[in-house]
Amino acid sequence: MLTATKDLVLAQSDNSWPTHFRASLYLGVPFIGAQLAQLAINTTDVLMVGQLGATQLAAIILATQVFFTIFIFGSGFANAVVPMVAQAQGRGDQVSVRRSVRMGMWVVLLYGVLTAPVLWMAEPILLFAGQKPEVAALAGEYLHIAQWAIFPSLIFMVLRAFLSGLERAGVILYVTLVTLVLNAALCYVLIFGHFGFPELGIFGAAVAALGVALLGAALTIGYIRRQPELHRFELFVRFWRPDWPAFGEVVHLGIPISVTILAEVSLFTVASLLMGTIGTIELAAHGIALQFASIAFMIPLGLAQAGTVRIGLAYGSGDMVGVKRAAIAVLTLGVGFAAVGSTIFALFPHELAGLYLDTRRPDAAEVLAFAGPLIVIAGAFQLVDGLQAIAAGMLRGLKDTTIPMILAMIAYWPIGFFCAWAFAFPLGFGGVGVWFGFVLGLASAALLLNWRFFRLLRRVSAAPAAS
């Protein structure tokens, strides 16, 4: 067993700074590319359905938000598999790798079954929430098909966690790029009825989403089965055999990850509602700034995933020096990339905002005037957002998820939301105040999570995992 991972352990024992920076980039770049490709898939759906009319556009935005909320919570269980695999691989325990991945698939399949009624009943739920009947009906129609994509999508996430833990991130990028191309083609053909296919409208977008999810899972399974060096893990042999301790660990680690992700996503949702109460122009400007911040966030998110893997591998092999250097490497890269992005945001805010606006429209100048300052603030926002995301990823590498969840929720809501509300309304800063609150909340999360990581590192260094 140890022989099978000899090369990996030797690579982990090379603690030179160039090795750590190279390894972080080697893992991080494919993760970043895959995140950007996934963002492009979601954008493609909205852009194409938007050509059908305002009602269809509103319906797919609602439907994808419902699906995304269910999916993002479930992805926490898949993310829990990453440190489990990385630590087991670091100590040369391929049996634990297999059990972690299998039970990860069990958990997400069970989660899919439990959440299926919510997706199936989306139309009455949306009607109860006050949505227009025609919009709720279309959203429900979309989700009746797209809901089945939750199963292959989450299976893909678990298998992605397996490959990530083995530092095989490149294939994840390739699979995501293939699904990006297929999604665009299927949407074009099925939504609008080209090449002899019927015009299915929003229903066609749902069929495309399901087809792409199935393809992503199938390609990943095919890759794993065709790689001789991965056969020793026997992921799909006796798949029905349970391992309840591993099942419990996936749930124990995954729920805090899911809650943390959901808490951050919901903060942005509520912030949009706050901006909407200030004014339509402010909400439009907020949407533009948030779009740029979301794109920039893909970089630290990819580095955070790389940090989880690198730290998990080093910790599993008992290499505390490697843990510390892996952490410093991803943090340094995160700050470096954020500094470049922040500089671009600060120098060209109006030019960036103009990419989303038809300057010939009478309200464009107003939106541009509001969006410019928000994009400048988004530069500071992406720095602290990146630092807190990377810190959360590093803590996951140590399998520490519960305390980070509590710290993050304190930073997001009692600090972030309260400051956003206070700056916007009592202090009278309006939309700019909402973003000031964002920055303070995420800066608090960055400080708390990094403090937690380095404090925990000092503690575990006295009793490493491999001892």
From Swiss-Prot:
Residues that span the membrane, as ranges: 20-42, 57-79, 107-129, 144-163, 170-192, 202-224, 250-272, 292-314, 326-348, 368-390, 403-425, 429-451
Gene Ontology biological process: monoatomic ion transport
NCBIfam families: matE
Listed name of the protein: Probable multidrug resistance protein NorM
Family under the similarity heading: Belongs to the multi antimicrobial extrusion (MATE) (TC 2.A.66.1) family.
Gene: norM
Superkingdom, natural source: Bacteria
Reported function: Multidrug efflux pump.
GO cellular component, one term: plasma membrane
Primary location class: membrane
Segment forming the signal sequence: none
Membrane topology: Multi-pass membrane protein
Compartments (UniProt record): Cell inner membrane
Record GO terms (molecular function): antiporter activity; xenobiotic transmembrane transporter activity
Keyword tags: Antiport, Cell inner membrane, Cell membrane, Ion transport, Membrane, Transmembrane, Transmembrane helix, Transport
